[in-house]
Amino acid sequence: MVEPMNWISEVVRPRIKTLFKRETPENLWVKCPDTGQMVFHKEVEANHWVIPGSEHHLKMGAQARLKMMFDEGTWIDVALPEVAPDPLKFRDEKRYVDRLKEARAKTGLQDAFKIGFGRVGGLPMTLAAQEFGFMAGSLGMAAGEAFVRGAETALEKRTPYVLFAASGGARMQEGILSLMQMPRTTVAVRRLNAARLPYIVVLTNPTTGGVTASYAMLGDVHLAEPGALICFAGPRVIEQTIREKLPDGFQRAEYLREHGMVDQVVHRHQLKETIARLCSLLTNVSQAGAPAAASEAA
């Protein structure tokens, strides 16, 4: 004899569970690459994308960078020039224009740079941040124009220019037009030098390729975040070429600091204070806005 179906347990209850089931967001937790520890996403975001405990520095978006650095309510976005979106009509597995659309939808930016003008520790500054989430922060015409516009803003406002570098190198979809940005950005740095305005570079993870070979290594002062990969060709490529194992930590921020390529490795939480102090010293202006010599005399 077939038992009658229990409608409450077999039909009604499952439907109620399905009705009120809440999907768990995929990005609710962040896994630490060093320890494997799972940390609540909002906790990591509130800590400026540094894993509490291990202090591992995760990649940080350009908007979050500027928000972290500028004094609250003191900064504005600098409008960036428009460029031809796909001058070479490039196509690989996808059309280049489609890759640009995807990157813009993902990041909310037009390209891999964001420029801001405002105050840091009370001092006027122009900041440029590269967005690694936009096609690996690659250097193309738009990024080159953005860097130059940032330098022009610093020249116009007579402020230090601070760059947060994060890039996989030149953008292959733009070919020679991408490589042209290396000398163009170098000329912009030379103009800052001629105007005796500080140019400070913060090397973040990763800073590689054509960006390292141009404006990222031309600063008056080079700071780096802990553990950042800073190189032209990556360690895997070098090992495959020379068929030898590289030293531990090779091309990381601490290794470059030990070998004189980086002036200081600075924790992300100390970057604002460190940069404000450096700019105060280099411009001879105190963080209160008065000339440093006058402040000391007082």
Swiss-Prot record:
Purpose of the protein: Component of the acetyl coenzyme A carboxylase (ACC) complex. Biotin carboxylase (BC) catalyzes the carboxylation of biotin on its carrier protein (BCCP) and then the CO(2) group is transferred by the transcarboxylase to acetyl-CoA to form malonyl-CoA.
Protein's GO biological process: fatty acid biosynthetic process; malonyl-CoA biosynthetic process
InterPro entries: AcCoA_carboxyl_beta (IPR034733), Acetyl_CoA_COase_Trfase_b_su (IPR000438), ClpP/crotonase-like_dom_sf (IPR029045), COA_CT_N (IPR011762)
Keywords from the named record: ATP-binding, Cytoplasm, Fatty acid biosynthesis, Fatty acid metabolism, Lipid biosynthesis, Lipid metabolism, Nucleotide-binding, Transferase
Residues of the CoA carboxyltransferase N-terminal domain: 28-297
Pfam families xrefs: Carboxyl_trans
Family: Belongs to the AccD/PCCB family.
Cystines in this chain: none
GO cellular component, one term: acetate CoA-transferase complex
First-level EC class: transferase
Membrane-spanning ranges: none
Presence of keyword Cytoplasm: yes
GO molecular function: acetyl-CoA carboxylase activity; ATP binding; carboxyl- or carbamoyltransferase activity
This enzyme's EC code(s): 2.1.3.15
SUPFAM superfamilies: ClpP/crotonase
HAMAP family the UniProt entry points to: AcetylCoA_CT_beta
Protein location: Cytoplasm
Catalytic activity: N(6)-carboxybiotinyl-L-lysyl-[protein] + acetyl-CoA = N(6)-biotinyl-L-lysyl-[protein] + malonyl-CoA
PROSITE patterns, alphabetized: COA_CT_NTER (PS50980)
Protein name stated in the entry: Acetyl-coenzyme A carboxylase carboxyl transferase subunit beta
Subunit structure: Acetyl-CoA carboxylase is a heterohexamer composed of biotin carboxyl carrier protein (AccB), biotin carboxylase (AccC) and two subunits each of ACCase subunit alpha (AccA) and ACCase subunit beta (AccD).
Family matches, as PANTHER family: ACETYL-COENZYME A CARBOXYLASE CARBOXYL TRANSFERASE SUBUNIT BETA, CHLOROPLASTIC
Pathway the protein takes part in: Lipid metabolism; malonyl-CoA biosynthesis; malonyl-CoA from acetyl-CoA: step 1/1
